[in-house]
Amino acid sequence: MCGIFAYLNYHVPRTRREILETLIKGLQRLEYRGYDSAGVGLDGGNDKDWEANACKIQLIKKKGKVKALDEEVHKQQDMDLDIEFDVHLGIAHTRWATHGEPNPVNSHPQRSDKNNEFIVIHNGIITNYKDLKKFLESKGYDFESETDTETIAKLVKYMYDNWESQDVSFTTLVERVIQQLEGAFALVFKSVHFPGQAVGTRRGSPLLIGVRSEHKLSTDHIPILYRTARTQIGSTWWGSQAERGKDKKGSCGLSRVDSTTCLFPVEEKAVEYYFASDASAVIEHTNRVIFLEDDDVAAVVDGRLSIHRIKRTAGDHPGRAVQTLQMELQQIMKGNFSSFMQKEIFEQPESVVNTMRGRVNFDDYTVNLGGLKDHIKEIQRCRRLILIACGTSYHAGVATRQVLEELTELPVMVELASDFLDRNTPVFRDDVCFFISQSGETADTLMGLRYCKERGALTVGITNTVGSSISRETDCGVHINAGPEIGVASTKAYTSQFVSLVMFALMMCDDRISMQERRKEIMLGLKRLPDLIKEVLSMDDEIQKLATELYHQKSVLIMGRGYHYATCLEGALKIKEITYMHSEGILAGELKHGPLALVDKLMPVIMIIMRDHTYAKCQNALQQVVARQGRPVVICDKEDTETIKNTKRTIKVPHSVDCLQGILSVIPLQLLAFHLAVLRGYDVDFPRNLAKSVTVE
């Protein structure tokens, strides 16, 4: 949800103007995550000596768009933008309000005191902040914001002020602080007491570090440094030694930091580091990144990056690899489209091909999902499949449940992650649990993953983000390869998740003779799918015309059944998300159990009727709607002459195999939602109150 970006240049001279441009551009790359205010923190002096400037931190914060922050930056009269810094750390943040309304005081960076001794940017929610705040207030600390994050900044200062020895490291302070935090967080700290140093950490919220240098790096694998003795701080530290200032540095030794345990350029010291919530903010600067794990503390001191952990646990990986991103900058740019959402809708012919590339062999009718290959026999022996997700990803599970049940002959449950957790759903060792998330960081889905792992189930991730928490923590998985999706309303990720689950179903039954004809039928449908999607997209003008007739309405009902119930749910969600119209996806079989009361001549109704096993029942529902003076728009098969003849308004889509038809029927609804939002004057990519990556529960 919130966006974190920080930039540290070490012996790479940069003017303050260049530093600010880098920070602002980083925030712009994170805008798609959703936000309501933004801010930056940087060295504030105007001396020629960077160390003198680092003794003062300047904060600039603004409600609204990043563009408004950029304008505010250039209004600052006391900042010389042409001052050059040989070493500098700047931190920046886009805030999504969770505690306190959107305003400059509540925006990040949050500060420890009026002198800005410590500042911090934060993505997540601290659940015990009220207890921490109460303690700090009892010690005389005054709070100016309503945020949970300010508690973190003041907690660092409290630790620093009460540390008896003067040689405490920034890393040690942060380690002590995160021991007291409950909830989810990704944090980056800056301090006047530790000029040119950056410390970042995460727990339950993503954080990565990009590295850029003209010179060879010392290693491609950074070893983890562990504390050599147990800390004396307890689970609650008020009243402990830390409070009394007696917790000396010697009570908790730190593994040695030297040339064998750090990342740095070998030949020269010049290096740049980029801390970010996700890769889209760093890809234009570097493709070499380190993904932090929960409770990692990453520190840059004297241009050297080291990674620390407080304690060693079973299964810990001994280091963090420097990975190479395959993403390219042009993939996250709009190109000739007016919005990212429009671009992503029209990318679907290519994105479904990318999802299938190298996995589906149309010559010998085989499917090979490399990420599942080593576990497929175990999955085939399971007692049931559980698909766990939120929002659009949940709808992808609903859309493919029927074909999964048909081809695997296993019971398939599709669960909303939040409800799954609320019910303490029974999970067994012979269950296989799928976790579907575009970002791979969805908080409820991630909590569901950990819940299922504790109970011994095999876990499978289906994500669009390499290195995400879900992709790392699952036993195996499928990367959907849809490419970066920036628009908050998911489009191409939905169709790629759909195709990925169908491919999994095909892989599960490849050795069943009774299924071979059905497998071939579905695989031929997959082969034709990109061309059929292009055909649907060619109807854009027709759908735009329909939008001009509907955009002034306050509500719309979308009805269907069978394979298309999920299409109704997903279409209704898209309309809700970006047009702010009330919309409801209705199972046509439930029409007489309540929803029919809503139908009259004024209520816009969209029905999905395809030539599959539910055709006759859908026709019956259509007649019931018409009998109540409803005037439905019907999305139907272009070869369905009966429906076309008997219905005043139709959207005719090409025919495909029944279990893939939902991909072709959802695209008109994606286009309709887009055009409705544009006609109603709303920002399609950044709908109000919503975020792309929901990293808090």
Swiss-Prot record:
- Region feature (Isomerase): 311-678
Q: Which reaction does it catalyse?
A: D-fructose 6-phosphate + L-glutamine = D-glucosamine 6-phosphate + L-glutamate
A Gene Ontology molecular function term for this protein is: carbohydrate derivative binding
- Keywords noted in UniProt: Aminotransferase, Biological rhythms, Glutamine amidotransferase, Phosphoprotein, Repeat, Transferase
Q: What is its EC number?
A: 2.6.1.16
Q: Give one Pfam family.
A: SIS
Biological processes annotated in GO: circadian regulation of gene expression; fructose 6-phosphate metabolic process; UDP-N-acetylglucosamine biosynthetic process
Catalytic EC class: transferase
Task: Report what the protein is called.
Answer: Glutamine--fructose-6-phosphate aminotransferase [isomerizing] 1
Species of origin reads Mus musculus
Q: What is the lineage of its organism?
A: Eukaryota, Metazoa, Chordata, Craniata, Vertebrata
